From Swiss-Prot:
Disruption phenotype: Does not display a lethal photorespiratory phenotype when grown at ambient carbon dioxide. Inhibited by the antifolate drugs methotrexate and pemetrexed. Gene3D superfamilies: Aspartate Aminotransferase, domain 1, Type I PLP-dependent aspartate aminotransferase-like (Major domain). One of its GO terms (cellular component) is plastid. InterPro entries: PyrdxlP-dep_Trfase, PyrdxlP-dep_Trfase_major, PyrdxlP-dep_Trfase_small, Ser_HO-MeTrfase, Ser_HO-MeTrfase-like, Ser_HO-MeTrfase_PLP_BS, SHMT-like_dom. NCBIfam families: PRK00011.1. This is Serine hydroxymethyltransferase 2, mitochondrial. SUPFAM superfamilies: PLP-dependent transferases (SSF53383). Pathway: One-carbon metabolism; tetrahydrofolate interconversion. It is an enzyme of class 2 (transferase). Keywords: Mitochondrion, One-carbon metabolism, Pyridoxal phosphate, Transferase, Transit peptide. Its main location: mitochondrion.
Amino acid sequence: MALALRRLSSSVKKPISLLSSNGGSLRFMSSLSTAAMAESEKSRSSWIKQLNASLDEIDPEVADIIELEKARQWKGFELIPSENFTSLSVMQAVGSVMTNKYSEGYPGARYYGGNEYIDMAETLCQKRALEAFQLDPSKWGVNVQSLSGSPANFQVYTALLKPHERIMALDLPHGGHLSHGYQTDTKKISAVSIFFETMPYRLDENTGYIDYDQLEKSAVLFRPKLIVAGASAYARLYDYARIRKVCNKQKAVMLADMAHISGLVAAGVIPSPFEYADVVTTTTHKSLRGPRGAMIFFRKGLKEINKQGKEVMYDYEDRINQAVFPGLQGGPHNHTITGLAVALKQARTPEYKAYQDQVLRNCSKFAETLLAKGYDLVSGGTDNHLVLVNLKNKGIDGSRVEKVLELVHIAANKNTVPGDVSAMVPGGIRMGTPALTSRGFIEEDFAKVAEYFDLAVKIALKIKAESQGTKLKDFVATMQSNEKLQSEMSKLREMVEEYAKQFPTIGFEKETMRYKE
């Protein structure tokens, strides 16, 4: 490099004159410079104008898609238990200037300058997270940078386990989640099962409850380093104390994944996992009703006094923080963290407690009405925000019913139930009460929702009976071509929409909507 620089310098004999001493040339350059400056100023004003223009003006196509989604949310039944309607104040924070800042690192230790207010927002979010779940900050810490629930779980695994160490979690067809390490006999579906060895525990298929006795026996043989207590389609409460005992025997970490139920836990209407777990993860957009993000809570401080009488401290904090950044993420989403801080403040209010109480009452009434109509619920009922309907006794599956539900403006999702062999054509439908409760639905409304669901299932059975083949595509073809059945679906859709339109919108006003019919 030095030789190259010497050659370059020796080749330059004298300075190059950019301007002639000729006066005419100077006047020409001066006028050119003035013209260029004027053009630059004009260009600058154009992009600033563009940056400050509204969405309707800049991109009417995207604006129209958003308006269509508003109409869908207003006119339909949102029954997917992992969904909710977040508040206007949260959306204002998420759509704020906090999205503009890069802030790799943690408060007080960033790799970028200009983060004094980002630090304030993240620190406030952490403080409110601990307060929302009534945690002692000397015994618990929290990372609020994780982007979503699945990454949060993977970050915990990579922080606390070595590659190919062992994880036990609830089996996906029995109500578990992909991020807990799902695999089939022939394929590792989740990346977790690629990098770690995973083994499921399951429900007792006779009762629909987790088989804790078998879990304990399996743990003795498998010797897991971490056991997950958490689910995505389990309608009953976890026995955290029982899993804690199993973890103690195996010297395993207990990870509670409360993604679905964290809002209920924050409100104190169901038992908290924090008394028993070492680490707790949650998404923030389900029952918690915040923006789309995640949190990782971890124990810190004194763990135990060992046999030598020495204090042993928890070491989760540094390991988890390093797994999040720089291990698996770069810059955090500061707009999401700011919106989460707002949601966590709401979680400490009397209104929030009343809302979560109503979520449980609504789900209980929903389950009661479905049972009265002859539906089979996995575990026979519910203790939380969701019901899992096993449709096998009705002679139909979740995929076919889901297709009809969508056409009549009821959003629910097909779901595996114990005994299923296909995740694409499962035997169940999963439904929950958080979203519609946010819109003001109470018990009598969910009794009505159950009636509309029952009508949709009956239509699905008629379509199945008229289908020429046994495949899902044959069902869809009949659904799209049979005019009589289409008329029935149209009538049911009108009934659903008229009922749903009575209730308030969340996050936007009806008067501002483009599509009101």
